[in-house]
Regions:
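Acidic, low-complexity intrinsically disordered regions
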Residues: 1-184
């Protein structure tokens, strides 16, 4: 297999828990994220930022955006706007069968989110001619997974993360609120 070309850049991949309980930490999360981005902007401009958010679903916000772009920040009212959006969607949603898990605040698909985002990054790097010289995943969560139902299990995810650390040199950082990191994954 040919050695991948690097572009000398660093890619920061943020995976942020936006489940309802995280709203209790909103000001700390927003200030911490924006502060870190501001410090990194002063130090270097060769950083790409990818931001994903998850609760009971996972979606990307920005993908491979230069750190100098104005879109790389969190608005102060982010969690409040998210709460309002959830309420609007809940009112408009068609009735569905109710299960014991429905309606419980704080549902997190942490394992599915991490596994999916790591696989997405692998796919992107495979199809881009140049990959970042350094890739760092920053996972911000307030609790352990309690909603992943699909492909990923803790053991499969651990194997994937360890393989990427060993083979590709990727780094993974878990920033948690009120959790024991060993119990998360």
């Amino acid at each position: 297999m040919a050695e991948a070309k690097t572009n000398g850049q660093t890619e920061l991949v943020f995976l942020m828990d936006v489940s309802e309980p995280m709203a209790d930490f909103a000001s700390d999360i927003i200030a911490g994220f924006n502060g870190m981005i501001a410090r990194l902007r002063e130090e270097r401009t060769d950083i790409l930022v990818t931001t994903w958010q998850f609760a009971d679903f996972c979606l990307y916000v920005d993908e491979r955006v230069p750190i100098t772009a104005d879109s790389v920040h969190m608005e102060q009212d982010f969690f409040e706007r998210l709460r309002i959006m959830r309420e609007q969607v809940a009112r408009q949603a068609a009735p569905a069968p109710i299960t014991l898990e429905d309606g419980k605040p704080g549902r997190r698909v942490l394992i599915n989110a991490i596994g999916g985002v790591v696989c997405r990054a692998r796919y992107v790097y495979k199809h881009y001619p140049e990959t970042p010289a350094r890739t760092m995943f920053v996972i911000i969560t307030g609790g352990a997974d309690n909603a992943s139902l699909y492909y990923w299990t803790p053991d499969r995810l651990r194997d994937l993360v360890e393989r990427q650390e060993k083979e590709a040199g990727w780094e993974f950082i878990l920033l948690g609120a009120n959790i024991d990191a060993a119990q998360v994954v």
